[in-house]
Amino acid sequence: APKDANGKFDHNNALTGDDLMDFVDGQLFPYLKGFKQRADNANTIEYKIGEIFSEIKNKIQSGYSLRDALEKVDQLRFRSQDEKHELSYLYEAKIKNMGNAGRNGGEYYTPRPLIRAMIDVVQPKIGETIYDGAAGSAGFLCEAFDYLRQGGRDKVKISTSDLAVLQNDTFYAKEKKSLAYVIAIMNMILHGIEAPNVL
């Protein structure tokens, strides 16, 4: 959102109504879709953003409603890992609610206590490959990432090189449904996996 000299939201320069919709649909979404073609390789955050925006469409029909939503989102902070993690929990709660409401989100969501119990039994270790062949929302992978990032069962502090292994060479997923595919990528990014390996 545009800011004034004091870093506050600039209502005078903010697009709204049809102007905002034209910008989002005609410039912003095509630009973000283009990240996929401009990325160095498929294992980058840029590529994944391009994939997400290749799969979704802007469903908001009112530029005024979109402006209101953007102003609310602009007030949120996503700088620290804790803030990103908080957002990831909100995101997963929304997926869970979709399933509870009888919508298709339920087929992508496995209850987190069940996932945590399975992780406690398996006790994955850094250096192992974790694959989910029917990823849904990627809840298993996100919980396994959190478990390993926090040092596993013994809560041993992990090194920078261990974190790089977690980011790049640990988590792999497959999801054939396009909505679940986008949900999985977003969920993994919000949990801190910067370039999810989802096919």
Question: What annotation goes with each model-predicted range?
Answer:
Residues G105-L199:
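Conserved S-adenosyl-L-methionine
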Residues A1-I126, P196-L199:
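Non-catalytic, mostly N-terminal accessory regions of nucleic-acid modification and defense proteins
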